[in-house]
Amino acid sequence: MCIRDRNIGFNNTEFLEGSIEKLDELDKDLNPLIADKSVDIILSNCVLNLVSPESRSNLLRNIKRVLNDNGRIAISDIVSNKKVPLRLQNDHDLWTGCISGAWYEPDFISDFKELGFKNLEFAERSAEPWKVIEDIEFRTVTLVGNI
């Protein structure tokens, strides 16, 4: 356990460096970065919108894979009221500003639900949009649920 882990007062906490898109990437001993069913809770703050749409299904499968049987999620991210068009998705300034990769709000819950997550709800959802671009509303939400 690293010093940082001990300093926060928990003995079951570990900090790992890696890409959320590659939780299943194998190390030199052929072990994934994070083992199956080894995580109690996944907390994420504005990370998933930075994952390309092509990589999202793998990302979600890995989130489910690493959570234990009582695992929970609390994911704060940016969603949109309309699907973000490809020309905006390809705008690097909007991508780094957490806009281009915003999840279409109805898909955000349904994509987790399709993988078997339960008790999904928005613990928080901003009433007012954070940004509006080309008549697309972008807002913050916090999705909670469990396996």
Annotate the PLM regions.
Residues S80-I99:
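Short, glycine-/aromatic-enriched active-site segment of Class I SAM-dependent methyltransferases
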Residues D40-E54:
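A short SAM/SAH-binding and catalytic strip from SAM-dependent methyltransferases
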Residues L115-I147:
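C-terminal lobe and adjacent flexible extensions of AdoMet/dcAdoMet transferase-like proteins
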Residues I8-L30:
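Conserved SAM-binding strand-loop segment of SAM-dependent methyltransferases
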Residues D24-I42:
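A short acidic, Gly/Pro-enriched loop at the edge of an enzyme's catalytic core
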Residues S57-R72:
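A short glycine-rich, Lys/Arg-flanked "PGG" loop and its adjoining helix->strand segment in the class I
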Residues M1-I3:
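Short, small-residue-biased leader/transition segments that mark boundaries at the very start
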Residues G101-G116:
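Short alpha-helix
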